[in-house]
Amino acid sequence: MKLVLIRHGQSEWNKLNLFTGWHDVDLSQEGVVEAMTAGKRIKEAGLEFDVAFTSVLTRAIKTLNYVLEESDQMWVPVHKSWRLNERHYGALQGLNKQETAEKYGADQVQKWRRSYDTLPPLLEENDERQAKNDRRYQLLDTHAIPSGENLKVTLERVIPYWMDTIAPEIKEGRRVVIAAHGNSLRALVKFLEGISDDEIMDLEIPTGVPLVYELNADLKPVNKYYLDK
């Protein structure tokens, strides 16, 4: 069984080196090219899908659309869930990463970005950036909407969705592609591979490059590779 993971193509805020999180930004032109290239590589590799999953953020949705279009699979059913959203960067969202490092120190910012269990500064309740002000989250319990997340909290929302919704599809023999985000995919990869809390700090997933897992009957990876050429 194969599972394909794709981090969205470069976004406008990736290009500007800004913390993005749940803020909804579009793909950059380079990101569009990355997504289209991913779709072409998937087609060349002969990978076919029966069902697709993505977040409710534009950059991931558009990446999936380009991938399916370029691989001639636009008809594949797509399921969108906030549980596949990027990690919520709290009050860091919208800030420049370099300027934030100069203000708080590179070590502190690295902990906010990469540590498994260090929370970023949280959004204030009345901050206009609160996701509860966004119509796409209106049906969610307000207690489920974060004001900031570390990777541990991100994993705690991603893995139940994997276990309850995505994994059963794979066990039924359906071929799955997931287009999501750097940290929601890092959370899933940590779970699939059993990566330690310390080792996950060093894991980087490139934008727009399909990551193919070959899974056994227990959905444990037996092989993985990137479609990067």
Swiss-Prot record:
InterPro entries: His_Pase_superF_clade-1, His_PPase_superfam, PG/BPGM_mutase_AS, Phosphogly_mut1. The active site is at residues 8, 86. Pfam families: His_Phos_1. Pathway: Carbohydrate degradation; glycolysis; pyruvate from D-glyceraldehyde 3-phosphate: step 3/5. Transmembrane segments: none annotated. GO terms for biological process: gluconeogenesis; glycolytic process. It catalyses: (2R)-2-phosphoglycerate = (2R)-3-phosphoglycerate. The keyword Hydrolase does not apply. It comes from the Bacteria. Signal peptide: none annotated. The record marks 181 as: Transition state stabilizer. Substrate binds at residues 7-14, 20-21, 59, 86-89, 97, 113-114, 182-183. Its EC number is 5.4.2.11. Keywords: Gluconeogenesis, Glycolysis, Isomerase. It is an enzyme of class 5 (isomerase). The keyword Isomerase applies. GO terms for molecular function: phosphoglycerate mutase activity. Catalyzes the interconversion of 2-phosphoglycerate and 3-phosphoglycerate. Belongs to the phosphoglycerate mutase family. BPG-dependent PGAM subfamily. NCBIfam families: pgm_1, PRK14115.1. This is 2,3-bisphosphoglycerate-dependent phosphoglycerate mutase. The gene is gpmA.
